[in-house]
Every structure is written in structure tokens, then in C-alpha cells.
Amino acid sequence: MRLETHLRKWLNNKGDIMVITDIINAVKTGQLDDKLTALYGAEALASQKVRYEEVLLKAKDLLGDKEAHIFSAPGRTEVGGNHTDHQLGRVVAASIDLDVIAVVVPTDDFIVTYHAKGFSVSPVDLHNLEINEAEKNTTESLIRGIAAGFTKKGYKVGGFKAYSESNVLSGGGMSSSAAFEVLIGTIFSHLYNDAMISSEEIAKIGQFSENVYFMKASGLLDQMACSVGSFAAMDFANKENPQVTSIPFNPADYGYDLILTDVKASHADLSDEYSAVPHEMKAVAKLFGKEVLSQISLSELLENTAKIRKE
């Protein structure tokens, strides 16, 4: 679920898009309480209002008191299945209420200027969408790659200035990079494509950017979970068009909570090791004359364990 969808509807009901000062007042006076509660729950409403006010105030300082949009993209958790997406298998995943939010002002200069709390990002000129080896593993590469993915599919892109804040921990296993990719894709969709690009398409473009421009091998699970939102079952047997089924399920209704523990570690510098996983899994599949592991049975795998270890 993305706040932008709800916020645009609310603003349209008012008849116009609002400047940042007016959005701040709307947050303070409770006019967005229903939308924020839908995203984060009633117990988090007060803290989220403080968070949004702080982000909006900083955005006003950096971007000016201009007409703006707010976007949100969530992190994700794997409920069932890990490293099964790139093996054309199945997985159950869910978005979480930790997200990256951004205040965005459209521009006509074809440049993306992205300010983020805690780190700096160089402006990205969308006139140049070539792969840049020097940008490997950078935020700039993801922005450029998503813009390239949009144009390859015949969609429009354009410039914008943004200030963002994220509580999806980087390197914490919640897919902060996929959340960012979905955020950028959603911004391009809403600002320049009348919000007509599907969640699934945005996810695919995000994966393309991560694989080709960020240069990290990954399946489609992370982007799809962040983009589709809520609980979802995914079957990747059809590589180009995976089957995604939303599941109407709230763990709290059954007495369950998902607890995330910050163990003060990160896999942010392990991109090469992560990229090796699908290659190693496909190497095992090749021993059976198959492309991916979903094409062999569990019994075949167990019967040949010694051979696999030897190889």
C-alpha cells in the first residue's frame, strides 16, 4: 500500500495539489489521520505524524514551499520460501509497516535530484541512460536504471527533486533497495504516466535496474513484495509473468506478531556473495540437466546429495 494513492485522492477532493506548508498543516490538524492509520495502524499514528512533519519541514527547507506529492514504499519480509524466486519456484511474502517516504516536487529539467536523510546522492541526468560501471552498487545507478527500464518499455520519465527518509534498515534483510526501486518507479508512474503502470510492472523494472545497472543478481521476489504490498503468494514458473495472488490475511487477527531484531550487523557489503547464490543453485540444477532447481524433485536432490557435494 502506498500513501501517494490515498493522498492524491484526498487532495483531488480538495480541488488542487497543495504546497508543502499546507500539507504540514493537514498532518497537524488530523486531516490525514485516516490515511496514516491505514498504513501504520492506530498505535503508530502519533509517532508517524511527528515523522511526517519532520520530513515535510526538511523538504520545505531543501525544495522550497512548492506544490508537492508524498510517496511511500514498504520493506518486505519472506514468510515462506527463500532464494526460490530465481529458481522459478514459489514463495509467500508480505510488506511491512517500515517504509521509505519521500516528498517530491516535479521539475522540467530532466534531472533527478534526490536528497536522503543520512546519505548523499549525486544528481542523475536522465538524458544519459547508459550503463556506468563506475556507478556499480550506488543509488545513482538504481535511479538511472529505472529510468532506462521505463523508456525501454515506452513509458515517460522526467525530472524531480525529492527529500526522503527511510526506516527500512539497509542491509537488514528487509529489502531496502527494492523499496527504493519501487519508490522511484512509483514516482515516475504518478508524475509522468498518469499512475497507470501496474505494481507488477514497476517491480519488474526495479529488478531490471538492480540486475543490470546496480549489477547485483537477484530474483523478483523483493521488488514484487514491496510493490504489490500486503500478503501475497507468488509463483515464478512463468519467468516473464509470475502469478501473484494477494492473500487477505492479518497476523494480528490470529494472535501473531512479526518481531524484527536489530542485531547490529549488515549484509550491505556482501553483494558479490549474494549474487553467487543463484549461480551456485543453477550449477546444481545443471548436474541434473536442468536450468533451475524447481525443475527437479526433492527425492532426486536427496538421492544425489553425495554427488552434489563432490562436485
Question: What residue spans do the PLM features occupy?
Answer:
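Fold-level recognition of mixed alpha/beta catalytic cores in primary-metabolism enzymes, strongest
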Residues: 172-258
